[in-house]
């Protein structure tokens, strides 16, 4: 699928980071004979409790969790599949690393979506703030437990590098960063091996796969639940100064998907037509964007359709955020997160961190950081249940807060 130039680039980059294929803690569990070491990292992430909890974090805000829709877990599985295909077509030796990074890329996301991240960052500024990608790194390196002999999952450094989208500390970039301890850890490991790359080929692939899955599959869910129509998203492109260059392409995709849906032999009803239309849309978007990957400004990118990919993500997000239900959902989420933070941060009420799980109490860190760890790992529904436990039954369902 890809030209020789980008394949050669990918192989060169993989060769550079092959120096990072080692674990910091040497430990032989006697159960991994004849297993590829990087494949073990995939299993460790897949079977982690943090990954399982993604099933309770909605990919699209305001969607009832009981409905048949995507959540952060199913989204991560879809990102992993796309990443595997890209890595395979780029002829990487170890495609599983990009796949593992894709499984883990949302593992640090808090309840109640992006706005939950904003609220938690505001509450935890005293101990270095909060950022979803930084939290993912902390979870894998410190919080998750695999064995008593070491903290975290003891993943290969190459795998940890693969989930690092932004290699900055908070002083270098206060929007996208790693926590200071994790930044220093990774910097030390890279320096010790003479690796100067700050974003690995695995991370590049994961990042593109995430954007492609977001563009295609979130659109499908938004259409399925009536949050937006196909005409509306096409119109958003037409009126956007930043993304209007992609309007002709988006129009062509919409028309072609409609033509295919009209011709489908099973489309005897409008409901069947809508199903075929959505599936054709997602397939076309994924195929167009995956096929468009090449070498752009010295790294992986889209040769022609960057505005389409970014526009689908940002314009959909913008359109959905205008909905009243989404505004209420975010406001409710903020109240729950702030309430729980107040409870767990109370030195008298939560003396010796007894309200936190035992595995967090055992970590020697500031109270604010541990409270942030706990809340950020909660599923949306569990956070609401915990809030009601402390503030009274039905309190989480209030829709107006001062």
UniProtKB/Swiss-Prot annotation:
Organism domain of life: Bacteria
Keywords of the record: Hydrolase
Domain HD: 72-215
Pfam families named in the record: HD, HD_assoc
Biological process (GO), any one: dGTP catabolic process
GO molecular function: dGTPase activity
Family, similarity comment: Belongs to the dGTPase family. Type 2 subfamily.
PANTHER family associated with the record: DEOXYGUANOSINETRIPHOSPHATE TRIPHOSPHOHYDROLASE-LIKE PROTEIN 2, DEOXYNUCLEOSIDE TRIPHOSPHATE TRIPHOSPHOHYDROLASE
Name of the protein in question: Deoxyguanosinetriphosphate triphosphohydrolase-like protein 2
Species the sequence originates in: Vibrio cholerae serotype O1 (strain ATCC 39315 / El Tor Inaba N16961)
């Amino acid at each position: 699928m890809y030209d020789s130039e980008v394949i050669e680039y990918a192989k060169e980059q993989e060769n550079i980071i092959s120096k990072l294929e080692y674990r910091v803690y040497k430990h032989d569990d006697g159960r991994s004979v004849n297993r590829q070491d990087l494949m073990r990292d995939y299993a460790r992430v897949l079977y982690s409790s943090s990954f399982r909890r993604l099933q309770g974090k909605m990919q699209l805000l305001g969607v009832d969790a009981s409905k048949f829709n995507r959540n952060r877990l199913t989204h991560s599985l879809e990102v992993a599949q796309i990443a595997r295909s890209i890595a395979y077509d780029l002829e990487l030796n170890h495609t599983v690393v990009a796949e593992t990074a894709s499984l883990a890329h949302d593992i640090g996301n808090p309840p109640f979506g992006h706005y939950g991240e904003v609220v938690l960052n505001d509450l935890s500024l005293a101990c270095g703030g909060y950022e979803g990608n930084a939290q993912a790194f902390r979870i894998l390196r410190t919080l998750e437990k695999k064995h008593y002999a070491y903290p975290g999952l003891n993943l290969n450094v190459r795998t940890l590098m693969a989930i690092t989208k932004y290699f900055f500390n908070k002083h270098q970039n206060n929007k996208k960063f790693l926590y200071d301890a994790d930044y220093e850890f990774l910097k030390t490991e890279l320096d010790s091996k003479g690796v100067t790359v700050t974003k690995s080929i695995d991370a590049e692939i994961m990042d593109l796969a995430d954007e492609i899955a977001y563009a295609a599959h979130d659109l499908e869910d938004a259409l399925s639940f009536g949050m937006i129509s196909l005409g509306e998203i096409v119109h958003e492109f037409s009126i956007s100064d930043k993304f209007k260059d992609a309007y002709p392409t988006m129009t062509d995709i919409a028309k072609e998907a409609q033509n295919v849906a009209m011709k489908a032999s099973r489309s005897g009803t409008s409901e069947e037509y809508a199903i075929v239309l959505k599936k054709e849309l997602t397939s076309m978007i994924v195929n167009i964007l995956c096929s468009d990957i090449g070498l752009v400004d010295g790294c992986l990118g889209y040769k022609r359709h960057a505005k389409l990919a970014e526009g689908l993500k940002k314009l959909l997000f913008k359109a959905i955020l205008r909905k009243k239900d989404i505004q209420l959902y975010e406001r409710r989420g903020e109240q729950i997160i702030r309430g729980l933070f107040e409870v767990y941060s109370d030195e008298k009420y939560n003396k010796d961190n007894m309200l936190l799980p035992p595995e967090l109490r055992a970590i020697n860190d500031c109270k604010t950081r541990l409270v942030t760890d706990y809340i950020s790992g909660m599923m949306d529904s569990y956070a609401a249940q915990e809030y009601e436990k402390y503030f009274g039954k039905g309190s989480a369902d209030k829709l107006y807060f001062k």
